[in-house]
């Protein structure tokens, strides 16, 4: 059979795929979601339409369009067929022909073919000298599958990554090789702040399956003490260990972990190749807790394609269900479903933040406070969790001008939580608005700016304090320069508007207030209050 030419080289949209996740299929003119494409009657038309379908991430349509192209022997056409099949989650029929190809997509497709056929020996030989970060999971698990875990452990030590990841993957290897004591030791060495929900479920499943209840309880306490993990306090639908055990499942987990922990990769076209790799090689893992639906939906959400289909597929007992609703609310602006779900899951912090910001934005103080109160009344919440939500209540009261209530909450919060940037910023703003403790407020604000000069909220805090401490002109020196380049932080523009209004510059004041309204979905300003200020100027 003829030698397949180097795959994808002649397809313009696949000009480059790198470990840094350079764009492959970015589309400047995105079609309307759900648009129906007609099937061309000519082979040439079908070929062009297939390339376009891949270009706009409509992979299912791409596969349908290739049905009349399967007998065309042109390398360009065959390459397009291979790619369309794989990106739709199907192993290409002639994937074995890609053995000697060098491009990244072709190598991944052939690697998936080897794993699907349990040919771990050839996979190991292909990757045993591969030092690339992208291929690390393939090299590690091919070595382990060939009883060369010593090689895998040595390779892990050489990788320029953080210690928690190294401990995690070492734990995976020991767990797979049934050295449960060493596995547990490594899992316990993982910093809880490293874990996302998928990582947490993996370790919890390991602990529960192997009767390590004390360790499971410790992990539950540590993970749920963080704002991102609070939603798991009452969650008990931990997957069976069989969903993670086995070389295929372990590799699949590692690939998803790499995608989920690398933000630049998570939203890139490289992520789609790896996620389809997982679906094809480890279908049992891929259906566990709708993890793949969430990450596939995330890819389409941040690019183009039918993200809604994947989020809608997530079952209500999945920990990813609420994240899917949150993404949908962000995209559509409709919060009804998220609001109903949050009533059942009051400790899902991203939903709390989203809904509170929405109610502050629209002047619904009582609704914003009700969400916080509902969370604080949850029986599973610990003292640190209540303090966290009390900090949110302080922000609500500050936004609506109830400074005494905000200060009261902040005193309680500072007794239970370490002083973070949010606490320091809010305290400095309260003092500034009350025109007291201005030297301390200035010290707090300067500390925030020095700690993170890129934080617009820190500059907003400094500007508000300087306005009270040194006057409007000094504050303008701070806020105007930041406002020229800032696309976030509605309160900064409200404060700019206040200063312009105090100086009698009506036009600049109104422009700043309008900009504050445009950015007000961050929950830092109240639209009805800003509109009232605008009316007073007209």
Regions inferred by a protein language model and the residue ranges of each:
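Positively charged n-region of N-terminal signal peptides that target proteins for export
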Residues: 1-6
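Hydrophobic membrane-insertion alpha-helices, especially the h-region
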Residues: 9-22
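Alpha-helical solenoid repeat scaffolds
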Residues: 25-373, 382-403, 418-434, 450, ...
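Terminal, low-structured helical/coil segments at or just beyond the last alpha-helical repeat
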Residues: 252, 502, 507-538
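Short coil/turn linkers that connect adjacent helices within long alpha-helical scaffolds
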Residues: 342, 380, 414, 449, ...
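Amphipathic hydrophobic-ligand
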Residues: 406
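C-terminal soluble interaction/assembly domains
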Residues: 426, 461-464, 468, 480, ...
